[in-house]
From Swiss-Prot:
Protein name, as recorded: Sodium-coupled neutral amino acid transporter 3
Gene from which the chain derives: SLC38A3
Pfam family, one: Aa_trans
Transmembrane regions: 83-103, 106-126, 144-164, 187-207, 213-233, 324-344, 366-386, 408-428, 431-451, 471-491
Role this protein plays: Symporter that cotransports specific neutral amino acids and sodium ions, coupled to an H(+) antiporter activity. Mainly participates in the glutamate-GABA-glutamine cycle in brain where it transports L-glutamine from astrocytes in the intercellular space for the replenishment of both neurotransmitters glutamate and gamma-aminobutyric acid (GABA) in neurons and also functions as the major influx transporter in ganglion cells mediating the uptake of glutamine. The transport activity is specific for L-glutamine, L-histidine and L-asparagine.
Glycosylation sites: N74, N247, N248, N252, N323
Membrane topology qualifier: Multi-pass membrane protein
Keywords: Amino-acid transport, Antiport, Cell membrane, Disease variant, Disulfide bond, Epilepsy, Glycoprotein, Intellectual disability, Ion transport, Membrane, Sodium, Sodium transport, Symport, Transmembrane, Transmembrane helix, Transport
Superkingdom assignment: Eukaryota
Length: 504
């Protein structure tokens, strides 16, 4: 019996300006293809059905207005995470050459993964991650994608707020030139994280379109560029190895120089051994850093929303945006890891900023870097919140039109829950380590590959074609990384130690 024919609109866009062809293409509908009612598509502006003048305006019916540059800022900011603080630690446990190889491999794989997403979305006319899941596997696929996005991004937002909770009191303490932490409310991280969430994060999260956050994204990236410049600068001003009593100095730079001179006379033999970079390292923690590297370029839930809001969108243009964003973050990641590692070598801690406190807790430059990092992670939270809100819309309100009340309530509810987790959960990093180890491989490797395999018509690419075989291998790689990550975390818990080097 012949399969029914389905008319699909190729590359539909909300502003109708796409130039890659809008003619209907008649393709046989395979048994695994599904069409969801347009009314059930994403209510946060992430699908791209054409505007119909005969119907009541739908809030997906807006023109993409985000420029190429703003889109690069938004996607780069989505890629950048708190993991950049742990990459020097990862390099210390892999060596420079192995680190560079892993970082390059992950960057290329992330670009390939985005290519699969864009190609799948172009075939079926969908620009929502969850809707691709529906098209490939029906409601279970849609819910699985929405759940993975929700877990991954809640974990990411929690790690950002955790940084605010731990770092902001130290910044205030340094500004006030206090030797010890006081019991005042403005030195309490719990109060501070709530204050930042209400006054900065929530207003940005209430914006209706991601494009407007391009300005805050640009500022956030500027903060991380400043962090990188400071790391490079400090490489040439921090002695190696660090004197044993360096963490007792409190801003007396003449004393620091005297100690530096004395120690250099005493530890010349040890310095040559300790202060020599390793190019290839394999130890008990090397494998533990691989998941950190693998998840350094997580941005896939944000790719399709940014694609939707792009001015004059096309697959080629969005792929260029993705490649440029990945390339920028690749360079920043490598330089931050390299100069952070070459500053402290094997003495680097899992969070790079903590290591600098050994040199001088009241260093003005490091204080400014802390402020820059806090600013960057604060401005990243609203961008990460957008796909979570969209996923919740997909799961709970699939047939509802846009409502400002629901838009606000979901944002407030999410921030409230995340603040409660950050404040009351003592082992939050371990909890979200598991979440990241399970959801990230699905979002980066497994879902894009299997969605592509199911959605791409067999008439265009047979099941045994090279692209589909590569996609299946890509999915298998994701399962392998997920198994490795979970195994390392379980071993970590069983041994009662913590060796986390960072988190996206």
């Amino acid at each position: 019996m012949e399969a029914p024919l389905q008319t699909e609109m190729v590359e539909l866009v909300p502003n109708g300006k796409h130039s890659e062809g809008l003619l209907p293409v008649i393709t046989p509908m395979a048994g695994n293809q599904r069409v969801e009612d347009p009314a059930r598509s994403c209510m946060e502006g992430k699908s791209f059905l054409q505007k119909s003048p005969s119907k009541e305006p739908h809030f997906t019916d807006f023109e993409g207005k985000t420029s190429f540059g703003m889109s690069v800022f938004n996607l780069s900011n989505a890629i950048m995470g708190s993991g950049i603080l742990g990459l020097a630690y990862a390099m210390a446990n892999t060596g420079i050459i192995l680190f560079l190889f892993l970082l390059t491999a992950v960057a290329l794989l992330s670009s390939y993964s985005i290519h699969l997403l864009l190609k799948s979305s172009g075939v079926v006319g969908i620009r929502a991650y969850e809707q691709l899941g529906y098209r490939a596997f029906g409601t279970p696929g849609k819910l699985a994608a929405a759940l993975a996005i929700t877990l991954q991004n809640i974990g990411a937002m929690s790690s950002y707020l955790y940084i605010i909770k731990s770092e902001l009191p130290l910044v205030i303490q340094t500004f006030l030139n206090l030797e010890e932490k006081t019991s005042d409310w403005y030195m309490n991280g719990n109060y501070l994280v709530i204050l930042v969430s209400v006054t900065i994060i929530l207003p940005l999260a209430l914006m209706r379109q991601l494009g407007y956050l391009g300005y805050s994204s640009g500022f956030s990236l500027s903060c991380m560029v400043f962090f990188l410049i400071a790391v490079i600068y400090k490489k040439f001003h921090v002695p190696c190895p660090l004197p044993p009593n360096f963490n007792n100095t409190t801003g007396n730079f003449s004393h620091v120089e005297i100690v530096k001179e004395k120690v250099q006379l005493q530890v010349e033999p040890e310095a040559s051994a300790f202060c020599t970079p390793s190019y290839f390292t394999l130890n008990s923690q090397t494998a533990y850093t691989i998941p950190i590297m693998a998840f350094a370029f997580v941005c896939h839930p944000e790719v399709l929303p940014i694609y939707t809001e792009l001015k004059d969108p096309s697959k080629k243009k969005m792929q260029h945006i993705s490649n440029l964003s990945i390339a920028v973050m690749y360079i920043m990641y490598f330089l931050a890891a390299l100069f952070g590692y070459l500053t402290f070598y094997n003495g680097v801690e899992s969070e790079l900023l903590h290591t600098y406190s050994k040199v001088d807790p009241f260093d003005v430059l490091i204080l400014c870097v802390r402020v820059a990092v806090l600013t960057a992670v604060t401005l990243t939270v609203p961008i990460v919140l957008f796909p979570v809100r969209r996923a919740i819309q997909q799961m709970l309100f699939p047939n509802q039109e846009f409502s400002w009340l629901r838009h606000v309530l979901i944002a407030v509810g999410l921030l409230t829950c995340i603040n409660l987790l950050v404040i009351f959960a003592p082992n939050i990093l371990g909890i979200f380590g598991v979440i990241g180890a399970t959801s990230a491989p699905f979002l980066i490797f497994i879902f894009p590959a299997i969605f592509y395999f199911r959605i791409m018509p067999t008439e265009k690419e047979p099941a045994r074609s090279t692209p589909k075989i590569l996609a299946l291998c890509f999915a298998m790689l994701g399962f392998l990384l997920m198994t490795m990550s979970l195994s390392f975390i379980i071993i970590d818990w069983a041994s009662g130690t913590s060796r986390h080097g960072g988190n996206h």
